[in-house]
A protein has these predicted regions:
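Eukaryotic phosphotyrosine signaling hubs
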Residues: 6-7, 86-89, 161-162, 241-245
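Vicinal oxygen chelate
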Residues: 2, 11, 34-35, 66-71, ...
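Core segments of cupin and vicinal oxygen chelate
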Residues: 12-64, 117-120, 166-219
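Short consensus segments that form the blades of beta-propeller domains
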Residues: 46-48, 80-83, 154-155, 203, ...
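Post-signal peptide N-terminal segment of secreted/secretory-pathway proteins
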Residues: 57, 77-82, 95
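A short, acidic/glycine-rich surface segment
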Residues: 39-44, 75-80, 145-150, 195-199, ...
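Extended catalytic-interface subdomain
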Residues: 61, 65-72, 87
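Extended intrinsically disordered, low-complexity coil regions enriched in Ser, Thr, Gly, Ala
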Residues: 17-35, 80-87, 99-109, 173-176, ...
Length: 293
């Protein structure tokens, strides 16, 4: 490996069993580990209340080494999905967005936006849904690469997580933080109407928002969205994690020196780390990011 790559997206949900009906049954992800959150793991996240919480780790049937992890915790008071800073969405590569839309409707999954062709390219055909923890899930039928980036076409019904999306108070500050941390660059910047944000905040459909991508050469890692001024920090229970997309894991060639770790990096045996060194930090809006080496 050369350069940072996504390793996992972790989602906190009120019911593991309910979440599995979407991620395992509808998305057809393979469960590779079922267990509970360990004490060391919970302490690394500053979430001691999650010690013993149910946890499931899944992998796409393609075998791509990018994982989804579910952790069970109750929804906190004041949680309004889509309106808080921090990790907001997971973008997954899918074989057939229209078929996925039909299947999600039949399953009763909340739809944010139906599949829609994009004005600037015919290589992407995305839709968006809302998951059981309030997480936004972008399901993108990739038909080819873009001029500035290589994208993973799905090799199975739902393939790997390929972009993690964050909502932030200050897009520039978030870009600078992650570029300094990961050695990345800004892949592109745009200002456009964004249905996911406008629906969440009750804004007019034509309201434009700034967004940018964080890339390692031709690989996009993150999308960074400038959230409206009325956005709020994500509420979370004492000793718990943020609900919805709680953290993102990034595999790196080496751990950065002098990083402001939540706890010093340690070897972690549990999935999805399997013996790797893992360090945990907080970004500009308090979002948790794990660096894995």
């Amino acid at each position: 490996m050369s350069g940072p790559r996504l390793l996992h997206g972790t989602v906190c949900v009120p019911s593991i069993d309910q979440a599995l009906t979407l991620y395992r049954d509808v998305f057809e992800q393979t469960v590779v580990h079922t267990g509970t959150v360990g004490k060391v793991e919970a302490e690394a996240w500053e979430a001691p209340a999650l010690t013993g919480a149910k946890s499931v780790v899944m992998q796409p049937p393609s075998g791509s080494p990018v994982y989804l992890r579910l952790i069970e915790q109750p929804d906190p008071a004041g949680y309004q999905p889509g309106t808080h800073y921090g990790w907001a969405a997971l973008e997954l590569s899918v074989k057939d967005a229209d078929a996925m839309y039909t299947r999600l409707l039949a399953a009763g999954t909340p739809i944010i936006a139906a599949p829609k062709a994009l004005s600037f390219t015919d290589m992407l055909y995305p839709m968006q849904a809302r998951g059981p923890g309030g997480e936004a899930i972008y399901l993108n039928e990739i038909r080819g690469d873009l001029p500035s980036s290589d994208l993973p076409m799905a090799k199975c019904w739902v393939d790997r997580l390929f972009i993690a999306v964050m909502g932030c108070r200050d897009m520039k500050a978030s870009l600078e933080f992650y570029h300094a941390l990961l050695g990345t660059t800004t892949g592109g910047e745009w200002e456009m109407p964004y249905s996911v944000i406008n629906i969440s905040f009750g804004l007019d459909a034509s309201t434009a928002h700034k967004l940018a991508t964080i890339s390692d050469r031709r690989t996009v890692l993150f999308e960074v969205d400038q959230y409206p001024v009325k956005s709020t920090p994500r509420p979370q229970a004492k000793g718990g994690l943020p609900q919805g997309v709680a953290m993102i894991g990034v595999k790196v060639d080496s751990l950065p020196e002098g990083a402001n770790w939540v706890v010093p990096p340690i070897h972690r045996k549990e999935a999805p780390y399997l013996g790797a060194m893992v360090g945990v930090l907080r970004g500009p809006d308090g979002e948790l990011t794990e660096l894995v080496c």
